[in-house]
Amino acid sequence: MAAAGQLCLLYLSAGLLSRLGAAFNLDTREDNVIRKYGDPGSLFGFSLAMHWQLQPEDKRLLLVGAPRAEALPLQRANRTGGLYSCDITARGPCTRIEFDNDADPTSESKEDQWMGVTVQSQGPGGKVVTCAHRYEKRQHVNTKQESRDIFGRCYVLSQNLRIEDDMDGGDWSFCDGRLRGHEKFGSCQQGVAATFTKDFHYIVFGAPGTYNWKGIVRVEQKNNTFFDMNIFEDGPYEVGGETEHDESLVPVPANSYLGLLFLTSVSYTDPDQFVYKTRPPREQPDTFPDVMMNSYLGFSLDSGKGIVSKDEITFVSGAPRANHSGAVVLLKRDMKSAHLLPEHIFDGEGLASSFGYDVAVVDLNKDGWQDIVIGAPQYFDRDGEVGGAVYVYMNQQGRWNNVKPIRLNGTKDSMFGIAVKNIGDINQDGYPDIAVGAPYDDLGKVFIYHGSANGINTKPTQVLKGISPYFGYSIAGNMDLDRNSYPDVAVGSLSDSVTIFRSRPVINIQKTITVTPNRIDLRQKTACGAPSGICLQVKSCFEYTANPAGYNPSISIVGTLEAEKERRKSGLSSRVQFRNQGSEPKYTQELTLKRQKQKVCMEETLWLQDNIRDKLRPIPITASVEIQEPSSRRRVNSLPEVLPILNSDEPKTAHIDVHFLKEGCGDDNVCNSNLKLEYKFCTREGNQDKFSYLPIQKGVPELVLKDQKDIALEITVTNSPSNPRNPTKDGDDAHEAKLIATFPDTLTYSAYRELRAFPEKQLSCVANQNGSQADCELGNPFKRNSNVTFYLVLSTTEVTFDTPDLDINLKLETTSNQDNLAPITAKAKVVIELLLSVSGVAKPSQVYFGGTVVGEQAMKSEDEVGSLIEYEFRVINLGKPLTNLGTATLNIQWPKEISNGKWLLYLVKVESKGLEKVTCEPQKEINSLNLTESHNSRKKREITEKQIDDNRKFSLFAERKYQTLNCSVNVNCVNIRCPLRGLDSKASLILRSRLWNSTFLEEYSKLNYLDILMRAFIDVTAAAENIRLPNAGTQVRVTVFPSKTVAQYSGVPWWIILVAILAGILMLALLVFILWKCGFFKRSRYDDSVPRYHAVRIRKEEREIKDEKYIDNLEKKQWITKWNENESYS
């Protein structure tokens, strides 16, 4: 049981030490931080309490528990733990408080008793309680019957940390003498938590090990005044009853660690006297669930009036393992029956979150009702990376049933909420504050949260950071240790160190600023020394207030006057300067504020520069102040003086704008403008300044989301009289006219473009840091009858498929009078146009049918069905991938059968290219007859042509018959859905099918041909409703012809043959006659006068060669008209 007791306290242990974070009034400067160190391994700083001793001297101390400190000489042990007293000084160690310096080894053991596991002070001049929850009582030591019981016990010390009266000492061990064993009180572990009530009347103990670690809480009177007044009948009170010891009376589930609640009067003499028992749940007016075993009731404690009733005290106890998530129980006394009744139970929301590990009662909004703060350091949220939580329950005038807590979250694995403490009003704003420890956040952190009229400020005002591990395991506060009227904060750790942070007084410095003259008239110049002849007298005054009212130190400050700070930051030159201060318009002066509400002023002359161009915008002047630290600080009570700090909630500067004298405001010197605004959404072509209006659908502009990076909003602003017949009514110059455009998260300001350049209008647009808002100055003034058109260029990179529309808030502002300047919302609808297209082709596109009819039951392979047709559908995506949008599906209207139920096309197989494995639905439509697939390529005609005796005759003059088959008329179609998962840029689906030959032989053999139409289209399944799919469908046509053998040639009638022969003979005779008449058959003869031949006579001898040479003198040739056969020419 010893091990269990140790785990009871240490399973959330971790961490120590200190340092600064987001600074407010806890002084984190190293010179002002007080650090105290204990012996290594002693767990010095495990528990803390601030104590105010009034006698024998006024002293303020920090009490530090070190439950692993070495034993005192007479304790007969090695480590027993102890309690230390630390003076509030910069140097000097802490002193161990000597008590419990004895031991009886025959009846007790103090080894590892963990004295100092908790420590609490009763308040100024009050008692101190500290406990050792692992203290053991022994019986039959050194025998076989030896037994050990971890009862635990507590010591009460007087204000001077000594044992002086009967109430002091270590007899506070109510479990001793009761039934032993862990089922009852043998592992009581009294003292895991102990506290005093705020009215100093009671002392409260938690014993989470009672009843199988179900836990109890005990309350006893602790007030001498009541004892002296003979008021005895006030307890003790105990959950479960002091005499009954009935664990069923504990109002929380077992294993909750609630501790038995026991209240007893200090003055009782009979231990069975004045006991108030808790009634069984079935007898209680309001039934509450029982707490389970191992719930640890009593693990944390606090109390107060104004929790349920303003007059009755309520005890608050945590049970961090109740119901496996934790619970916190509110308990009250029933004075009539002397019972303790549960008033309310808060349940933890996270499994194993340790809800109730620490509790604090504090009135955060000062409404007179105490609020409850609960730590759950092991709460986690996987999605939000949360590691620990603190729940703040704001009291609704004593009613808790419908209170929804405010949850403060810590970072992952930080154990945020292991310590929660009411630290008092550290900034003296009238509202108490709390501190939350997170020892595993880096080296450990403590978060300071301020109270307010609205309750808790959920953003920490300061974060204290550790310089050694596990800083923030324990926290103490709500007491002024250094006597400056501000509560201080001490932070402990598990690395044997403690840090004290002193609170700095918070002061509010009121700043006023006046300028004379209050307007600049450029026509009135004086000899004041300024280059322009125009001077301004600037005066700023300061005074401070603080709490308490008696705090009146002399404070040195530095006042600063500065003009046109933002203008100079933007790179523009200033239009003014302070006299004798150079070109920078800034003037500083040291001042001393001697006491509260004493006003001190500074004054300087401001010169207007000569030849300034911007005469429309006002000249801003600011006054600010800083506290000046002295070169040497005096010491108070051996500590460095803590300087005051400015209130962070107060404005840092006072501001005034000096305007130029306005013109163009009419005879009454009042400017009544009439600004009007019109807008249109546009697209921008690339990076060019060319804009086109968006199309309008049902009165709303429609943005088609494609690849465009920018859109533009065309804005036109006019300032003209509303009634031309009464032009003096309005339409005056609009001074400081501006347009404020606020954009949704999906749009970001990029730039602005003016339609026409009008220098006198001085249009300029400036966006904030994240581009969510743009301020456009239209002119100062924006004159009468002016108009301007410009474009706000907006980036659409954040517009996604989940963006249904775009809302831009447009608001015109002017310092001139105009009441009708209501904001306008520019709306546009976002349409997602998916660049998906589908096309289809059939291979072959013409097929034949023929042969004989074969029944469905006789078919074993696909070849027996009919001609092969492969449909290929190609899907192309020219846009962005569909991964983040949804799933595209190809829908194919498959012509399965004709209207009488006979097969038309038989789908054999579906294949894909460029996609993940495609599974089309319904699967039963694919090869539903389980035919054997063919692995050979098809020829043009697979069906053997056979003669069919159907008595049909083929006529040359017969009319050609055809029919079109489609789903909407004469075909029963099945919708085949094929998800296109993994579609990137393009993909193909191939549907292998067979023409059902028998159906065509039976139904369509009399037709010359048929067309089969098949339609396919794409749809997208997505959460977005604004999706458009152009060109998302296609149609494929296949033409089917009967084979030639289906229609047999049966001969031509004889009379046609006879007529053809006679017609041919007649035509031949006619042709011969015509040719004869034309002399075609007459033989041609030559005329005698015409020579029949033309030749040259060359005698043979004339061709002879002499001496192998030709004869040079050849004779002239003669023409011959007659041949002489006897002469030789060859």
From Swiss-Prot:
Lipidation positions, renumbered (S-palmitoyl cysteine): 1078
Q: Which cysteines are joined by disulfide bonds?
A: 86-94, 131-154, 175-188, 528-535, 541-601, 665-671, 765-776, 920-967, 973-978
Tell me the segments the record calls region Interaction with HPS5.
1077-1083
Q: Which residues bind Ca(2+) 2?
A: 425, 427, 429, 431, 433
Instruction: Please give one Pfam family short name.
Output: FG-GAP
One GO BP annotation of this record: ectodermal cell differentiation
InterPro entries referenced in this protein's UniProt entry, alphabetically:
FG-GAP, Int_alpha_beta-p, Integrin_alpha, Integrin_alpha_C_CS, Integrin_alpha_Ig-like_1, Integrin_alpha_Ig-like_2, Integrin_alpha_Ig-like_3, Integrin_alpha_N
The name of this protein is: Integrin alpha-6
Q: Which gene encodes it?
A: ITGA6
